């Protein structure tokens, strides 16, 4: 299976938490890049219409790293039911996909490989 680019979309309740999660997953090389901005969300929750400010977060990674990234987002997320949506990238430039792949090779795999030398 070819390694392709994906975007994992989630929302967080604060800029501080979005930033902290972004730094953790980029440092762990679970994704190459994270973008986030403030949004207004209107949604139904337990029979009530909610109207809240949140931060939408776009995690850019590869199909091979997506499963581990999503598990880490779930682990770090404060919501009972976090939004975690995987979108496939299309028409991605070769240089961008190469960069994305190189920067999304999570450290655990690299450390195991280096430890075997």
Give each language-model segment a name:
Residues 1-117:
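Positively charged, small/polar-rich N-terminal and surface patches that mediate targeting and assembly
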